[in-house]
Amino acid sequence: MTDSSISPSHPAGLSRALDNFLTRHRIGVWRVVVTFVLASLLFGHSRWDGTWVSPLLLTLGMLGVSLATVGRLWCALYISGRKNNTLVTSGPYSLCRHPLYVCNLLGILGLGAMTESLAVTAVLALAFALMYPAVIRTEDRFLASAFPEFAEYARRTPAFFPRLSLYRGESTWTVHVSSFQRNIADSVWFLGLSVVVESFDLFHDAGVLRAVVTLA
């Protein structure tokens, strides 16, 4: 049975339909999740505030956000101007097929840790786990149909979890400067969100905001 002949009622067809739905609506789902997080920060305060757990979570969060930002810039350096027309397999893309999403997970967990709430971090991690496997499968199907060499690339390169032994760099690399400049904003937004998260904490400490719930 070929891909084009799979019926929507077939299990594979249903799985693909669900993947496509989650891929199309992931931004809307994230908006709901972000609204929940902002409401939690507005009306809640961490139960770990004033304990040794608080600086630990903050440090881990800053580390995650920093790694995510640097990683996304590294990916943008390789992929800018080449997305959908060239199969990039070197640099970060030699470690795994979807390094941008690895960076997204690091940033999401980092932001969650910076809220100093394990519950908020768990919600963010769950949202990622529900949506991004579908996004990865959808993108893999597109790449397989667009690039004949993708099958060999997928055979040797893991989809998500990086394998450091596979790293292969380039001695020279042509950068599409205009595309890279456009992607810079997409690469550093985790830093902006980290400022927003910390602002809520400062407002609570200053008495500008009053917590009505305790965040675990």
Curated annotation (Swiss-Prot):
The chain crosses the membrane at residues 27-47, 50-70, 116-136. Its main location: membrane. InterPro entries: Phopholipid_MeTrfase. Gene3D superfamilies: 1.20.120.1630. GO terms for cellular component: plasma membrane. It is a multi-pass membrane protein. Pfam families: PEMT (PF04191). It is found in: Cell inner membrane. This is Cobalt-zinc-cadmium resistance protein CzcN. It comes from Cupriavidus metallidurans (strain ATCC 43123 / DSM 2839 / NBRC 102507 / CH34). The lineage of its organism: Bacteria, Pseudomonadati, Pseudomonadota, Betaproteobacteria, Burkholderiales.
